[in-house]
């Protein structure tokens, strides 16, 4: 019994520490966002409504976690707007589709809805 426990602990200890698995990659999120577009156009397939809701729920979760910490909420911003911003951003970066989806969503929302201090820094950096 002790030998089995020691062996199990040793095997766990040999697992790579740097390995991680994100819930969604950018590619997986975009697949679900595309399903949402099909639903909106009335050409949805079986499972598209579920996939669309999953994508929107994921984006809403990222928004709720990072609002004010990274980007600023504006009165009247809808989940539909946040979803559209995310869809456009992820589509424009196919070379990053392997990255964690939460990271891409956060970047998309940060660029679309920067806090006032960040807006001023962006303007100064662009020479505006």
Model-identified regions with their sequence ranges:
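Absolute protein N-terminus
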Residues: 1, 21-22
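Sec-dependent signal peptide recognition
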Residues: 1-9
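Short N-terminal leader segment in a subset of presequences, especially plant chloroplast
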Residues: 9-13, 110
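N-terminal signal peptide c-region/cleavage motif recognized by signal peptidases
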Residues: 14-18
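Short N-proximal segments of mature Sec-exported proteins
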Residues: 22-88
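Compact alpha-helical subdomains of small soluble proteins
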Residues: 37, 64-128
